[in-house]
Amino acid sequence: MQDFKTHLEPLKEGKNLLGFSGGLDSTCLFFLLVGENIVFDIALVDYNTQKQRLEIIQHAQKLAKTHHKKCYIHHAPKIAHNFEMQARKIRYDFFETLIKEHSYKHLILAHHLNDRLEWFLMQLSKGAGLNTLLSFQAYEKRESYAIVRPLLYTPKDTLKTLAKDLKFFEDDSNSSLKFKRNCFRKNYANSLMQDYSKGIIQSFKFLDQEKERLYPLTIVSQMHGITFFKYSQNALFMVDKILKQKGYVLSFSQKEEIKRSFFSLEIAQKFIIESDKEHVFIALKPPKTLSMPKDFKDRARRLDIPKRLRPVLYAEFLKQPTHDFLTRFKQSLMDL
């Protein structure tokens, strides 16, 4: 469990929130964190799909009270279709609301080595690139917080051994083959983990190290709600990474469209991606279209500010109107 302890370092500073389900993984992580004197609270989503849902909620509340922790419960609306994707969105929206309201610095999740292998195999079968194959990271920076997955190199069998005297609940949906992940688990991942777990751990460590070398640190700046960085051969990787930090995951077809459009398009009617000769920009699309005055348009044009960014900048300009607003933005690009 040395890898586990290494990944706890960030949790020693700031407030922490554990995503808790009452299942094997999050229960083990709960007690491992308690054993390491990590301070945290817990958050649970009730999807109203489990027979034991009320017992799970009561158990979570009792556990939190016993260990002097806050316990947040969210009762999700009924999910009619695409359960896994909708459940994930509900879960992360709930976590991010709590993080914002209570100033949590870290979101702790109980993903383990088996989860990572299942994801890897699923993406491999789709024809994914390195960034998507390795999208599960032990430490993942988001805009206002970081996701920490201390168990990412820990096999599920290790957790089963640790949990032999602990109370936890089995989720019936984990055995349902109508979910693709469960098919990959049953048909491929389980047997690979049973026979080759040590080699799989080492391979993921090598791949993580090589990913860091392939995608070196890129300086990212932000001004007036626009995130930007210098264009390089890793530009698509950076766009994917930044959008993920903002809570949006690009599909393969969207990535292809970004390349075809030379980094100048809208994504999901929500994000603007734009570029000039040297930079790539990412911004939230303004909620409403504003009519820009001619002098603002002219100044933006003379400064070679890309067209898609002008409405974003104008919306920000209205909040803090100064005569050198656009000039300072242009200067920030030159200073990058």
Curated annotation (Swiss-Prot):
Location(s), subcellular: Cytoplasm
Disulfide bond sites: none
Superkingdom, taxonomy of origin: Bacteria
Binding residues for ATP: S21, G22, G23, L24, D25, S26
Annotated catalysed reactions: cytidine(34) in tRNA(Ile2) + L-lysine + ATP = lysidine(34) in tRNA(Ile2) + AMP + diphosphate + H(+)
Gene3D superfamilies (alphabetical): HUPs
Gene Ontology MF terms in the entry: ATP binding; tRNA(Ile)-lysidine synthase activity
Family: Belongs to the tRNA(Ile)-lysidine synthase family.
Name recorded for this polypeptide: tRNA(Ile)-lysidine synthase
Organism: Helicobacter pylori (strain ATCC 700392 / 26695)
Gene encoding the protein: tilS
